[in-house]
Design a protein with these regions (language model features):
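Conserved, mostly hydrophobic/aromatic
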Residues: 3, 41, 62, 101, ...
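Flexible C-terminal active-site loop/helix
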Residues: 1-15, 25-26, 39, 303-380
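Metal- or metallocofactor-binding catalytic centers and their adjacent structured scaffolds
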Residues: 37-112
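Metal-dependent enolase-superfamily TIM-barrel catalytic cores that perform enediolate-based chemistry
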Residues: 128-237, 241-242
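Glycine-rich, aromatic-flanked loop segments that form ligand/cofactor-binding clefts
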Residues: 93, 102-142
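Short Gly/Pro-enriched turn/cap motifs at secondary-structure boundaries
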Residues: 22-27, 152
């Protein structure tokens, strides 16, 4: 079974609730679906956290290398793509697009073998997992309503990120956290994401350590991206001295970039993003390397239904996974699938799909509405 085509389906027309911090709007294309088509009529679907214009440029490089390759050997084929592009955007748009191709190939491989990706990765350690509802921070009064809605939807873990946190005053930071804890109560886990990968992040180690101490007073589960994303030394020091877990690494790509962060214990929890790190093949290797060093794997997932489906297969296959990220609400998640596969149970858990490939049935009307394109009919 050979690869005969790779198609890009750019998504526009929606954002996560609250919009984007960096000025993007509904007409911006930040997510691109990737479809891999085989000569036997079976297709797979992937997702990339990158604009279609960058993906188009990368596809011009990668397509000639991928066409004619086996459609059911994702790890080997995508390693070939990595190895063949050291001088062509390594770590950037090239790696991002390889992520989407890899996810799509695993989806296709699962369909051909009639197995979920998690089983093909080595086996399933769990059949469900706790999602944390991921939402943007804002002023306390508005935030309160968003939190109430997330709890009403069944979330028992919620992460608040970016917005004014760390950008106005320490007093406002604590008011936001205090309001959040008061709103959700003691039984809902709360995580805080400072968004240190934002433009011109102003804070360093001392701010992060002092803020982490304040967060401990409110029972915060972890403190995410309190420093700039390349501050390895700062993270090592902060992780050693903070009383709560420190998390980061969502902007890194390729397994090699994660090695010093894992081996130097720069974070307590590591957060690769499957839609840009290199796909399922690469992220699984990162997760298991972290596991060998007693660092918890928590996939970053500010993405689409396809990305969330890939994350669910990953957390099923990693021994110590405890959470998966779920943007809420998000049309690129709920509107791209048929049925209600992301419904939470009474414990606030998501079932991990057991069907072939990524395990979900895509909504062709939803995909066409946001991309203006149709999926290729698949024989499986």
């Amino acid at each position: 079974m050979k690869i005969t085509d790779i198609r890009l389906l750019p998504l526009t027309g929606a954002t996560a609730d609250g919009g984007w911090d960096q000025g993007f709007d509904e007409q911006e294309n930040l997510h691109t679906l990737v479809e891999v088509v085989s000569d036997e009529g079976v297709t797979g679907l992937g997702s990339v956290y990158t604009s279609s214009k960058l993906c188009e440029g990368a596809l011009g490089i990668l397509r000639p290398m991928a066409l004619g390759e086996s459609a059911i050997e994702p790890a080997r084929v995508c390693e070939k793509l990595h190895q063949s592009t050291f001088w062509q955007g390594r770590g950037g748009a090239i790696t991002h697009l390889i992520s989407g191709i890899d996810i799509a190939m695993w989806d296709l491989f699962g369909k051909v073998t009639d197995q979920p990706v998690s089983r093909l990765l080595g086996g399933r350690y769990r059949e469900s997992i706790k999602p944390y509802g991921s939402l943007l921070m804002t002023e306390p009064d508005v935030l309160r309503a968003r939190l109430e809605d997330a709890v009403a939807r069944g979330f028992r873990a919620i992460k608040m990120g970016w917005g004014p946190f760390g950008r106005v005053s320490r007093e406002l930071d604590e008011e936001i956290v205090s309001t959040a804890r008061e709103t959700v109560g003691a039984d809902v886990e709360l995580m805080v994401d400072a968004g240190g990968s934002d433009r011109y992040w102003p804070h360093g180690y001392k701010w992060a350590l002092t803020t982490s101490q304040m967060l401990c007073d409110y029972g915060i589960t972890w403190f995410e991206e309190p420093l700039r994303p390349d501050d390895l030394a700062g993270y090592c020091k902060l992780t050693e001295h903070a009383r709560l877990p420190i998390t980061s690494c969502e902007v890194l790509t390729r397994r090699q970039a994660f090695q010093p962060w894992i081996e130097q214990r720069a974070v307590d929890y590591i957060q690769p993003d499957v839609t840009k790190v290199g796909g399922l093949s690469e992220e699984f290797r990162i997760a298991m390397h972290a596991y060998d060093h007693s660092i918890l794997f928590v996939p970053h997932g500010w993405n689409t239904a396809v990305g969330l489906a890939a994350d669910l297969q990953l957390v099923a296959a990693v021994p110590t996974a405890r959470w998966v990220e779920y943007i809420t609400p998000a049309p690129y998640i709920e509107d791209l699938v048929l049925g209600d596969p992301f419904a939470l149970d009474d414990k606030g858990h998501l079932d991990i799909p057991i069907g072939p490939g990524l395990g979900l049935d895509w909504n062709p009307e939803g995909i066409e509405r946001f991309s203006g394109m149709q999926l290729t009919p698949s024989d499986v």
